[in-house]
Amino acid sequence: MSAIVAHGITVTLDGTRVLDGVDLTVAEGEWLALLGPNGAGKTTLVRALSGTVKHGGTVTFGGAPSSDGARADGGPRGAGGPRERARRVAVVPQTPVIPPGITAFEYVLLGRTAHQGMRLSASLDDRRRSLAVLQRLDLERFAQRDLATLSGGERQRVVLARALVADAPLLVLDEPTAALDLGHQFEILELLAELQQERGLTVVTTLHDLGIAGQFGDRLAVLSEGRLVAHGAPAEVLTPEAIGRWWGVDATCTVDDEGRVDVTVRRRRVAGVEPAANPAATPATTSADDATPVSGR
């Protein structure tokens, strides 16, 4: 069964057509990675799917009927108002808004009450569920810490916890690892993969790193200039020819037994220019006696 069926999604912002008739289907329990160069429309498509930007076309969730067009508030017709969408779709924006002075627990609790209104309406069950998610993500020790004092990786786990506590079947993430180093990127994505399996979640995420997309996405979709130009399994989408066409780089793609794709991007040589010598490959010839002294400690 399809978790999302989007048909003819069109978005115009400030007179510019950002998305142009995008058709996209995401199966239940699938991880779809949205790819494309900067300005391709990835974030706008995520906003259209999650109902936070006005759009033309239709979006259907889990077989629920949807009408043409979009409401004035940006939400897809047939998906209900903001509270109903909060039950269906949990969103992790690229730059989450973090209220000053809020604790990690209070922030996660907002994920339970988004469809209810004010944070003060949280029930005892909401609080228990919020604490349980913090425990699952190994964040319990940070529950009463000011969210702004946590490291980037810890903060991103809390942001993910807020989305998970909503118990929505669809999780939409816009560049969830953009501000993290490589180690923390894989930590967050491995955790997300575990949670997807545990909960049977449908995951839609935008990514810039082709190698990461090839390792984690069940299916990939590529946008270019507001149009969907490819959609399929990683091995079908991530080929040297396709990467050269859409990103303008040379790449080698290796497919493993599970259909995951490892992407290696190669530096392009400029005709007539010799590459600079690699210092690491040149034997050292300077002795300690020849070294230039440095003032200081």
Give each language-model segment a name:
Residues 4-6, 19-21:
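Conserved structural motif at the start of ABC-family nucleotide-binding domains
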Residues 35-37:
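The feature captures the beta-strand-to-loop junction immediately N-terminal to the Walker
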Residues 50:
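Helix-to-loop junction immediately C-terminal to a conserved catalytic motif
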Residues 109, 124-142:
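Conserved ABC ATPase "signature" region
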Residues 121, 146-150, 154:
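Conserved ABC ATPase signature
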Residues 171-175:
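Catalytic Walker B motif of ABC-type/P-loop ATPase nucleotide-binding domains
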Residues 246-297:
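ABC ATPase nucleotide-binding domains
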